[in-house]
Amino acid sequence: MKPTEEKSAPKAHATRSSESGRQGFILDLWGVRYQVEDVSRSVAFYTKQLGFKLDHQKLPAFAQVSIGNLKLILSGPGASGSRPMLDGRRQEPGGWNRVVLQVADLPARIEALKKAGLRFRNEMEVGPGGRQIQIEDPDGNPIELFEPAR
């Protein structure tokens, strides 16, 4: 590259224009962040119980695990992604928004996970889109297991 040439910025994925004509600024989905109390415990849960792969970790504050195209960012106390909000509210584990993971043979998965001692939020639900059930990670963060209708 010549000294007068500038390196071009990465190109964003094509996005729909807003009404004002500007392009979107979102480049891509990075991942989903869950607040956790114990990063090591959460890594063990996601890798051993659900088959995630450990990408990297900086204990005790942070780890990233993945499965397929999903990156799950686990932020423990002290991580930059866990700091209090401007109004003082603490980011805490739990809630109702959740990661939805597709599975095959949901009843068999439920049976195996119950034998492993996982916590369930509900019984299996069946609807027009498929079957689902919610489990919790060790910090109470919800995870939905979903089997699409055939």
Task: For every predicted segment, state its role.
Residues 42, 46-47, 113, 140:
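Conserved active-site tyrosine of GNAT-family acetyltransferases
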